[in-house]
Amino acid sequence: MSVNNTYYLVETYVSQCDYSDGEVIALTPEACDKLANNRIPHRVINDFFSEEEHTKDNSVYFFDQIKWFKQFDVFLKNHIDYCRVNDIDLATAHYDPIKFLIDSYITYSFILTGFFKNAVPSSIKLVTDSLCLRQDYSLYKIFRLQKSFYTQLLPTFCQQYGVTLQYVTDKDSLSDLRTPNKGMLKARFKDFLLRLQLKSLLSFIRYRKYLLFKQRKGRLYSKGILFLHTGIYPIDFIVRRAFFEGARVFTMSEDFIFQEGRYTQSIALDFRKTVSNSFNETIRKECMQAAHKLKQQDGLLAWIDEKCQGNVSTLILPYLDNFINHVCVEDIVKIDKASDFYRKEKIDFIVTRCSSGRDSAFILSAVNTKHRLKKICFQHASTVFEQLSLLMYDVYFFDYYVTTDSLSEKYFKIRTNNEVFRHCKIVQSSHYLSALKSSHLKKSRWLKGAKETIIYAPCDTLRGIYNLNTPLYDPNWYCNYLKELIGYFCERRDKIFIFKCRPLGFGWVERVLVPYIKLKNFANIRIENKPLISYLHRVDRIVLDYPTTGFYESVVAKVPTLSLYKGNYLIWEEARKFFGPMLQPFTDAKEAIGHIDRFLASDKKKYVTELPLAQSDIADLFHRMEVSG
């Protein structure tokens, strides 16, 4: 610690800065990497707090937060007549982004509280380039570039602890960063496709309409089904089956609901069209008044301040204000249109992969007691973690949850034995994993070389965004961990390793570790960025450190697989027993490397198992869901 207790908190490395008159603390993997490359002594912010302490009561927090969402819903109903009359819970409908926002503020507040109490700084110099970014208070843009949480929170904490705060910014980064309005360009491109009828052609190919020579009166004949999240196999497969069973198929894409004909695709509902200006204006005024009164809601805001250990709700208020004044207004108008659409078109089922998308919120909220349709969610993410957030994303808003395998079915049946989730029935359709298994067996194995090929797939990483009920590895800790694993891989010259990353510089792994591997030019490490399933027939073994969907895909393909998981994260006990040696806990890189070493030296058969899949027909599944009430 420096004599005058001056600290440089480095979020973005600035080469012109003189770091010599204080202790340097790296806040991000990128900063840590740059400081190390420039041989500047530093520590990381993780040295000042305990992750285990922060996450120890997460299950209690989960249900406590659900109560907070309910209070928020009551507040909105008290001030917005449409929500009260139609019993619409708009806050809970947008659970995902609101939770990410609040949990991120709570996490960063915990980190800074640990730093201020343990470092006892007298002055802080925040080195960052996020000052040049225009703050956007949209809940659905918190994953994109914005002023960092450190930039937002540090003034509050410095005032609370009586610490002086200065900013150090690269002047070159302060230039006006103007980029094309991607949303506008995308909308214009979509209109262009609609005019050319190219979307009808894409639909004709995607859903294999060319195989449907005449309308069938199958088991789903005349049933109206609205599909969200099309364009991926698990949903497109169901769309095709619905076609061949005679259903009336509708698909949604952003501001449009399309009716899928035998050869063409036509617009059934355009959410952009204004129906009643007076209705829109009434909703806008009520939402504006609600947003104003939110500032006086001591109970809602006090809960946030208590969890953040400081007066942080003032920073979150602009996001909630934006949510009420913009998202709620837009949603209510769309909900009214969607509700009328369900009635006119006699929609029987809505099929999605989750409730966390922007479109899902109003589409699902539009279903009320006036409609006799079923809301169905097909599992989008498999996991062995005790991941409570999945219950909200995949179960809470639905009548049926369709799992991909028998193990997941058993897990969700146990976890939904709770008054909050008991209304949702758990069933299974293994069509995705069964198709993956069949496809994998048909593919010829990659020609084996003299050395075994092992693919290592790190978990997806989100820069600076937290969900306290989803296991997320801390970026700074995880970056150092991955560097140690890469060091081990390069020493194992008897093997060839594929380091799988995301394309297009998705996160800090691509910005920090991919250049690191390329710079070192390791002879036995290759970088690949295609989906994991495209490598299943090309590799001898698979190593993961986050047992979710990729783990299940590898297991069903019968590829010898080892998945590590951080030991302080809870996993389902039955999954631990079922997968046996294929799941191994670790606390640090040394322990993880030990597990990998034993895996590479062991008989492959010890790391292969048969994932139970119950075969079922999609049409039968829908019929059972309809008649069961």
What residue ranges belong to the model's regions?
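Catalytic-core helical/loop segments in enzymes performing group transfer/polymerization on anionic/lipid-linked
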Residues: 1-629
